[in-house]
Amino acid sequence: MTIKLIVGLANPGAEYAATRHNAGAWYVDLLAERLRAPLREEPKFFGYTSRINLAGADVRLLVPTTFMNLSGKAVAAMATFYRINPDEILVAHDELDLPPGVAKFKLGGGHGGHNGLKDIISKLGNNPNFHRLRVGIGHPGDKNKVVGFVLGKPPSSEQKLIDEAVDEAVSCTEIWLQDGLTKATNRLHAFKAQ
């Protein structure tokens, strides 16, 4: 089993770039930077894309330029064009149920109220069986404050923890493609930024 498409969820535009909801894009941006594969806008895929070669595998990167709740349009366009199955896709997204400094891989499951995941599941023919990278951003403690929280910028102390978890997730993605998901998952799930 190999990954052929890695997606980082985000809202477009400078005003959202540093918000918690864009944590998935931070991960893809760092992966592209580390592997010297700059992202370029590709209108037919409704996003910024690049291509990397990891452990002999050809992997496409995508950061949709649609709004978060329309992310599925970009993912489905790329998956259809390159004939990529849902279980060959890794979607990185912000995760309220994990604290800053923690990131975890997961296969399948629901959308947990995340509008980006909800749209991707829908546009992949109601198929939730894609991989996810859940980047912890913490929870405001009150569900009525969630929207403002995810669209807000984390304080520098939290940003540092999120950045460290994203950095570790990039390293673990390279391990996944070279040595398999089990080894990558064991390492990532043992990590907690201090």
Curated annotation (Swiss-Prot):
InterPro entries: Pept_tRNA_hydro, Pept_tRNA_hydro_CS, Pept_tRNA_hydro_sf. Its EC number is 3.1.1.29. PROSITE patterns: PEPT_TRNA_HYDROL_1, PEPT_TRNA_HYDROL_2. Hydrolyzes ribosome-free peptidyl-tRNAs (with 1 or more amino acids incorporated), which drop off the ribosome during protein synthesis, or as a result of ribosome stalling. Catalyzes the release of premature peptidyl moieties from peptidyl-tRNA molecules trapped in stalled 50S ribosomal subunits, and thus maintains levels of free tRNAs and 50S ribosomes. TRNA binds at Y16, F67, N69, N115. GO terms for cellular component: cytoplasm. It is found in: Cytoplasm. It is an enzyme of class 3 (hydrolase). Monomer. It comes from the Bacteria. It holds the Pfam family Pept_tRNA_hydro. The record marks N11 as: Discriminates between blocked and unblocked aminoacyl-tRNA. Keywords: Cytoplasm, Hydrolase, RNA-binding, tRNA-binding. The keyword Transferase does not apply. The active site is at H21 (proton acceptor). The gene is pth. The keyword Cytoplasm applies. GO terms for biological process: protein quality control for misfolded or incompletely synthesized proteins; rescue of stalled ribosome. PANTHER family: PEPTIDYL-TRNA HYDROLASE. The record marks D94 as: Stabilizes the basic form of H active site to accept a proton. It catalyses: an N-acyl-L-alpha-aminoacyl-tRNA + H2O = an N-acyl-L-amino acid + a tRNA + H(+). It comes from Enterobacter sp. (strain 638). This is Peptidyl-tRNA hydrolase. Belongs to the PTH family. Its main location: cytoplasm. Signal peptide: none annotated. GO terms for molecular function: peptidyl-tRNA hydrolase activity; tRNA binding. CDD domains: PTH (cd00462).
